[in-house]
Protein backbone atom coordinates (compact mmCIF):
# COMPACT_ATOMS: atom_id res chain seq x y z
CA UNK A 1 0.00 0.00 0.00
CA UNK A 2 1.45 3.34 -1.10
CA UNK A 3 1.19 6.61 0.73
CA UNK A 4 0.11 9.17 -1.88
CA UNK A 5 -0.05 12.94 -1.73
CA UNK A 6 -2.44 14.41 -4.29
CA UNK A 7 -1.66 18.10 -4.93
CA UNK A 8 -4.19 20.36 -6.63
CA UNK A 9 -4.76 24.08 -7.02
CA UNK A 10 -8.33 23.98 -5.70
CA UNK A 11 -9.75 21.46 -3.27
CA UNK A 12 -11.78 18.92 -5.30
CA UNK A 13 -15.09 19.53 -3.54
CA UNK A 14 -17.78 20.57 -4.30
CA UNK A 15 -17.89 18.99 -7.74
CA UNK A 16 -18.59 22.16 -9.70
CA UNK A 17 -15.88 21.90 -12.35
CA UNK A 18 -14.45 19.22 -14.60
CA UNK A 19 -11.10 19.48 -12.80
CA UNK A 20 -12.77 18.85 -9.43
CA UNK A 21 -14.69 15.88 -10.79
CA UNK A 22 -11.55 14.34 -12.31
CA UNK A 23 -9.60 14.84 -9.08
CA UNK A 24 -12.44 13.41 -6.99
CA UNK A 25 -12.65 10.28 -9.15
CA UNK A 26 -8.87 9.84 -9.19
CA UNK A 27 -8.76 10.11 -5.40
CA UNK A 28 -11.67 7.69 -5.06
CA UNK A 29 -9.92 5.05 -7.19
CA UNK A 30 -6.49 5.63 -5.64
CA UNK A 31 -7.91 5.28 -2.12
CA UNK A 32 -9.08 1.73 -2.82
CA UNK A 33 -5.54 0.37 -2.44
CA UNK A 34 -3.57 3.32 -1.08
CA UNK A 35 -3.56 5.90 1.69
CA UNK A 36 -4.33 9.26 0.06
CA UNK A 37 -3.71 12.74 1.46
CA UNK A 38 -4.68 15.92 -0.37
CA UNK A 39 -2.98 19.31 -0.39
CA UNK A 40 -4.75 22.16 -2.17
CA UNK A 41 -3.09 25.53 -2.71
CA UNK A 42 -6.44 27.26 -2.15
CA UNK A 43 -8.46 26.68 1.01
CA UNK A 44 -11.64 24.65 0.57
CA UNK A 45 -14.68 26.90 0.37
CA UNK A 46 -17.29 24.32 1.31
CA UNK A 47 -17.71 21.47 3.73
CA UNK A 48 -15.87 18.46 2.38
CA UNK A 49 -18.67 15.91 2.85
CA UNK A 50 -18.43 12.93 0.52
CA UNK A 51 -14.74 13.21 -0.36
CA UNK A 52 -13.62 12.77 3.26
CA UNK A 53 -14.33 9.04 3.19
CA UNK A 54 -11.54 8.62 0.60
CA UNK A 55 -8.95 10.78 2.37
CA UNK A 56 -6.56 10.17 5.18
CA UNK A 57 -5.72 13.86 5.69
CA UNK A 58 -6.44 17.05 3.78
CA UNK A 59 -4.61 20.34 4.15
CA UNK A 60 -4.31 23.52 2.18
CA UNK A 61 -2.33 26.65 1.58
CA UNK A 62 -3.85 30.02 2.25
CA UNK A 63 -3.38 31.83 -1.03
CA UNK A 64 -5.80 34.74 -1.43
CA UNK A 65 -7.29 36.31 -4.55
CA UNK A 66 -5.17 39.40 -3.94
CA UNK A 67 -2.04 37.25 -3.73
CA UNK A 68 -2.95 35.47 -6.98
CA UNK A 69 -3.31 38.85 -8.72
CA UNK A 70 0.05 39.92 -7.32
CA UNK A 71 1.61 36.65 -8.50
CA UNK A 72 0.22 37.12 -12.01
CA UNK A 73 1.63 40.65 -12.19
CA UNK A 74 4.98 39.53 -10.77
CA UNK A 75 5.55 36.31 -12.70
CA UNK A 76 3.57 36.45 -15.96
CA UNK A 77 6.60 37.52 -17.98
CA UNK A 78 8.39 34.34 -16.94
CA UNK A 79 5.61 31.80 -17.20
CA UNK A 80 2.03 31.26 -18.35
CA UNK A 81 -0.70 33.20 -16.53
CA UNK A 82 -2.29 30.05 -15.09
CA UNK A 83 1.08 29.00 -13.70
CA UNK A 84 2.05 32.45 -12.42
CA UNK A 85 -1.11 32.61 -10.34
CA UNK A 86 0.11 29.76 -8.12
CA UNK A 87 3.71 30.89 -7.53
CA UNK A 88 3.21 30.87 -3.78
CA UNK A 89 6.16 30.48 -1.43
CA UNK A 90 3.94 30.05 1.65
CA UNK A 91 2.07 27.15 0.04
CA UNK A 92 5.39 25.61 -0.94
CA UNK A 93 6.64 25.80 2.66
CA UNK A 94 3.49 24.05 3.92
CA UNK A 95 3.72 21.42 1.18
CA UNK A 96 7.42 20.91 1.89
CA UNK A 97 6.71 20.22 5.57
CA UNK A 98 4.03 17.68 4.61
CA UNK A 99 6.35 15.87 2.23
CA UNK A 100 9.26 15.65 4.65
CA UNK A 101 7.10 14.71 7.64
CA UNK A 102 4.88 12.09 5.99
CA UNK A 103 7.35 10.19 3.83
CA UNK A 104 5.11 9.77 0.79
CA UNK A 105 5.91 7.15 -1.87
CA UNK A 106 4.09 9.08 -4.59
CA UNK A 107 3.21 12.73 -5.17
CA UNK A 108 0.69 13.53 -7.90
CA UNK A 109 0.34 17.10 -9.17
CA UNK A 110 -2.89 17.89 -10.95
CA UNK A 111 -2.62 20.36 -13.82
CA UNK A 112 0.18 22.36 -15.39
CA UNK A 113 -0.75 25.45 -13.35
CA UNK A 114 1.21 23.94 -10.44
CA UNK A 115 4.49 24.30 -12.34
CA UNK A 116 6.17 26.22 -9.49
CA UNK A 117 5.36 23.54 -6.91
CA UNK A 118 6.37 20.77 -9.32
CA UNK A 119 9.79 22.36 -9.89
CA UNK A 120 10.24 22.86 -6.15
CA UNK A 121 9.27 19.24 -5.50
CA UNK A 122 11.76 17.90 -8.04
CA UNK A 123 14.49 20.07 -6.48
CA UNK A 124 13.57 18.88 -2.97
CA UNK A 125 13.63 15.24 -4.03
CA UNK A 126 17.08 15.72 -5.56
CA UNK A 127 18.47 17.76 -2.62
CA UNK A 128 17.30 15.33 0.06
CA UNK A 129 17.68 12.20 -2.07
CA UNK A 130 14.04 11.25 -1.41
CA UNK A 131 12.65 8.04 -2.84
CA UNK A 132 9.43 9.58 -4.17
CA UNK A 133 7.79 9.12 -7.55
CA UNK A 134 6.43 12.37 -8.95
CA UNK A 135 3.57 12.34 -11.43
CA UNK A 136 2.21 15.36 -13.26
CA UNK A 137 -1.34 14.96 -14.54
CA UNK A 138 -1.72 17.62 -17.21
CA UNK A 139 -5.03 16.25 -18.62
CA UNK A 140 -4.24 17.49 -22.10
CA UNK A 141 -1.78 19.82 -23.77
CA UNK A 142 -3.01 23.24 -22.73
CA UNK A 143 -0.43 24.73 -25.07
CA UNK A 144 -2.31 23.24 -28.03
CA UNK A 145 -5.62 24.52 -26.69
CA UNK A 146 -4.15 28.03 -26.49
CA UNK A 147 -2.65 27.74 -29.96
CA UNK A 148 -5.99 26.62 -31.41
CA UNK A 149 -7.85 29.33 -29.53
CA UNK A 150 -5.52 31.97 -30.98
CA UNK A 151 -6.86 31.19 -34.46
CA UNK A 152 -10.39 32.32 -33.54
CA UNK A 153 -9.72 35.27 -31.22
CA UNK A 154 -9.57 39.01 -31.86
CA UNK A 155 -6.20 40.77 -32.08
CA UNK A 156 -5.41 41.29 -28.37
CA UNK A 157 -6.65 37.86 -27.29
CA UNK A 158 -4.92 36.26 -30.29
CA UNK A 159 -1.57 37.69 -29.14
CA UNK A 160 -2.21 36.66 -25.54
CA UNK A 161 -3.17 33.10 -26.54
CA UNK A 162 -0.11 32.79 -28.80
CA UNK A 163 2.16 33.96 -25.98
CA UNK A 164 0.51 31.58 -23.50
CA UNK A 165 0.85 28.71 -25.98
CA UNK A 166 4.60 29.33 -26.34
CA UNK A 167 5.14 29.52 -22.58
CA UNK A 168 3.06 26.42 -21.91
CA UNK A 169 4.91 24.46 -24.61
CA UNK A 170 8.15 25.02 -22.70
CA UNK A 171 6.58 23.97 -19.41
CA UNK A 172 4.83 20.87 -20.72
Where in the sequence are the language-model features?
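Short, conserved loop/helix-junction motifs that constitute active-site signature segments
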Residues: 30-31, 124-130
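Short N-terminal targeting/anchoring amphipathic segment
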Residues: 95-116, 131-135
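Histidine-centered beta-alpha loop that forms part of the nucleotide-sugar donor binding/catalytic region
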Residues: 9, 112, 138-141
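A conserved catalytic-core segment of Leloir-type glycosyltransferases
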Residues: 38-98
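N-terminal subdomain of nucleotide-sugar transferases
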Residues: 1-58, 100-102
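Short, charged/polar "capping" segments at the starts of alpha-helices
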Residues: 44-50, 116-118, 144
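Acceptor-binding helix/loop patch of EC 2.4 sugar-transfer enzymes
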Residues: 66-85, 135-170
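Short, hinge-like loop/turn segments at secondary-structure boundaries
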Residues: 54-57, 125-126, 151-155
Amino acid sequence: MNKILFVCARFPWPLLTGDALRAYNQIKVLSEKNVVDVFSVEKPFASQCDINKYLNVSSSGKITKLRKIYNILSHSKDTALQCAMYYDQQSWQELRKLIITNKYNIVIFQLVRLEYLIQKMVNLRNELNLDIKIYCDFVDALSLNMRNRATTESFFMKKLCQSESQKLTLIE
